[in-house]
Amino acid sequence: MARSVDSDVLVIGTGGAGLRAAIEAKERGVGVAIVSKSPAGMNNATVVAGGGFRAAIEGLTPEEHYRDTMEVGKRLNDPKLVRIFAEEGGERVLELRRFGVEMRVHHGGVSVGTIPTLRGLGITKPMVKHCRSIGVEVVENVVVTKLLKKGEAVVGAVGYDVHVGEPVVFSSKAVVLATGGAGALYKRTDCPLRVTGDGYSLGYHAGARLRDMEFVQFFPIALAEPGEPPFLIGGAITEEGRILNTLGEDIPKKYGLTARPLVLKSRDLLSRAVMMEIAQGSGVSGAVLVDAREVFRRRNVEYLAYTGPVKYLLEKLKAAEKPFRVAPICHFCMGGLVMDENGYTGVPGLYAAGEVVGGVHGANRHGGNALTDITVFGARAGASAARRSRRVKAKRVEELAEAEIRRYEVLAARDNGYNPYIVMERLREAMWAKAGIIRDSASLAEAFEEIFDLRGMAERVMASRGRDMLVALEAPMALDAAEMIVRAAMERRESRGAHYRSDYPLEDQKWLKPVIISEADGGAMHLTT
């Protein structure tokens, strides 16, 4: 027996974009439900973000913010979206204080959070609390696997409660997708393992178009010591320290990287340079070195506290005494659903916001822009969904969910088959090795073949426990997202921003256009430019 959740607006995802959309819709006087496949506000990219918002605040002008964003995005961004983003960003970021978010204001943005590796909790925790206080219905531990359509319109969704072990059917007049990106498709990532690209798949199968899926951003400097967490390293440690190969060569100097701060303005170039050094044999077990000994001698710990897990580096790794290993890590997806300035995807009833959307960041993202993005377009998508919910009537959706519920039942009853964790592990290995920072035609073809093989395995997985069921239901959606990344990377025969092909190493003005993905009649993935 399925549980029913009815609302005017359904928001899928409880990261910053989803929470902001839910608050905006609720404040406009409509009934709102928000669903998360984990505890609300947890296991999303917002939580592990560095806590920095870049916006037109304290001296940075909207025009400067617009120009920087377009430049870093290699002008593949949608200029209309970027203009709104730059002009509204400052006000929207400061507005978070109204929802209980504490922040430190500085030139060009704000910073939040106090836990070095989980600064984003300073965003999601108070916003979840605010959602509950204003009457948003919060549904937790439910993985949504399909959007329900009546005719051309999205009228709800269906998912599975992995704690209780029952289907959940959502009826709504409008849906906001805010499921985040797909960083967990890669072996090395700072994203939680639940960031598996669900929204790309959900939107795609509901008829939405996607763009820029080939552009996956890798943070260039993250801890790569054996057995240690892959913490991001930035700030003074990377700007004032030395990033070295085994020959003692300074890698940024060797590759002529001068834009500063490196990890904000040159993420793609530095990531590529590090991986080239590793590929050429000038690394250490898949890593290079950061020598921050002089930094720790000159700077006090309080100054360095915002640059990464300083206490961990000093006490566990003895970073004041010797260099430590680092390597790039998958951090963000620039591509996603095509939307207009109000979060509308072109599918009636379906809106989107946050990392699941493409167009704002173009070919590469400027550091600090992701969190500003979720506030600006989360609010806009929530407002648009609320407006639609006032002018349409609710539809009965139970019959629309029947086929998906039967799929859950078959999966739960299967007593032999493949382990879903193995499917996801193989996918992450393939994406890291074949569709990561340095790509070419051959490696992408190998990644595509692996995805094809894994699809067959994913159809025959078994899931005897709730957590197994979660991974089993994530796997087909993750494979959709992975195929989009690989297919788009195969299509774009140039190098631009975060997309680098060693067989097409130069930027080509003919490719100053997005690769668009849609589902063709019969279910095939269709690409156009």
Enumerate the language-model features and the residues they cover.
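Glycine- and aromatic-enriched mobile tails/lids
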Residues: 5-7, 16, 24, 28, ...
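FAD-site-proximal beta/loop scaffold in flavoenzymes
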Residues: 146-164, 169, 318-360
